Design a protein with these regions (language model features):
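A short secondary-structure junction signal
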Residues: 94, 139-144, 179-180, 191-197, ...
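Hydrophobic, proline/glycine-rich low-complexity stretches
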Residues: 1-71, 75, 79-83, 278-279
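A short glycine-rich, His/Asp/Glu-containing loop-to-beta-strand
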Residues: 36-69, 162-205
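Glycine- and acidic-residue-biased ligand/ion/polar-headgroup-sensing regions
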Residues: 43-60, 69-95, 195-237
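Acidic, low-complexity central loop/insert segments
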Residues: 86-134
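Double-stranded beta-helix
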Residues: 122-182, 187, 206-231, 258-280
Length: 280
């Protein structure tokens, strides 16, 4: 197996609005998440969130404590949320073992223990997407499925944004330190998410897009309300959203995305909305 990581530094909005396409993609887009028998991570300075993925194919992959953590184990001072977006898989955390099927999630609390990822079938490997944030205390591990989620049906087909927001690793379902994760599924014929757009200056966010055909693409919108920029993305890619930025998208096909947040509070409704007509 191989572990890869890179560090992404935070950007000031006054600086970011002058970035060209190459710089925007370099600083905010995470293109390489799933590579066979690799664990790939981005250590972000936005609330020190780690965004990554593991794709075990015939091997057991270990979640290694990367150097920026300066810790004996990855979870020594961190909590983690994991979603399986591939075939059936297994996550082991210390003496605990969790089986995760497609679109099932797992919360891991902080503590000194080894974490491993494996697939049940190498021909249909699991794909583990994860977000991790610093944690001030330990909360119990827990597997969460859509049956456990707080579900909000939003939008309409006429507005091209009919979707179900599955709040899964949130404080309405289980205790966490600062991590909040969920999964939004867009209905056929709907392509817009998070519109009208909003920001939440108390929390940063990361979006991971999947369930989009290979010959289609997603256009993610970011930036300040009066200085928006776009990032064209493919499936199985993620994007960082600073606390000062909107985070919205439209695509050429319906899709699903996983959102993860961390920061000052755990209030999902703490959002500052903008009028669609104010966007520039």
């Amino acid at each position: 197996m191989k572990t890869n990581y890179e560090i992404r530094y935070a950007a000031h909005p006054e600086d970011a609005k002058s970035y060209d396409t190459t710089r925007i993609r370099r600083d905010f887009l995470i293109e390489k998440i799933f590579v066979p028998n690799e664990v790939n991570m981005v250590y972000s300075m936005y609330d020190r969130m780690v965004v990554g993925g593991a794709l075990p194919v015939g091997e057991v992959l270990t979640l290694e404590a990367i150097d920026p953590l300066k810790a004996p184990f990855f979870l020594t001072r961190r909590e983690m949320g994991i979603y399986n977006v591939g075939g059936p898989g297994i996550v082991k955390a210390g003496d605990a073992e969790f089986e995760l099927d497609y679109k099932e999630a797992l919360y891991l609390g902080s503590g000194d223990r080894e974490v491993t990822f494996e697939s049940k079938d190498a021909a249909h490997p699991a794909k583990f997407y994860f977000n991790s944030l610093t944690a001030h205390r330990n909360y119990p591990d827990r597997k969460v499925t859509k049956a456990d989620a707080v579900v909000a049906e939003m939008g309409s087909l006429e507005g091209s944004n009919h979707r179900n927001i599955n709040k899964m690793l949130v404080n309405q379902v289980l205790p966490t330190c600062q991590l909040q994760m969920g999964m939004t599924e867009l209905a056929p014929g709907s392509v817009w998410n998070t519109m009208p757009a909003h920001v939440h200056s108390r929390r940063m966010e990361a979006y991971f897009y999947f369930e989009i055909p290979e010959d289609h693409a997603i256009c993610h919108f970011m930036g300040e309300v009066g200085e928006t920029r776009h990032v064209w993305m493919k499936g199985d890619q993620a994007v960082l959203s600073p606390e000062w930025s909107i985070h919205s998208a439209a695509a050429t096909h319906n899709y699903t995305f996983i959102w993860g947040m961390g920061g000052e509070n755990l209030d999902y409704g703490d959002q500052d909305f903008s009028l669609i007509t104010d966007l520039k």
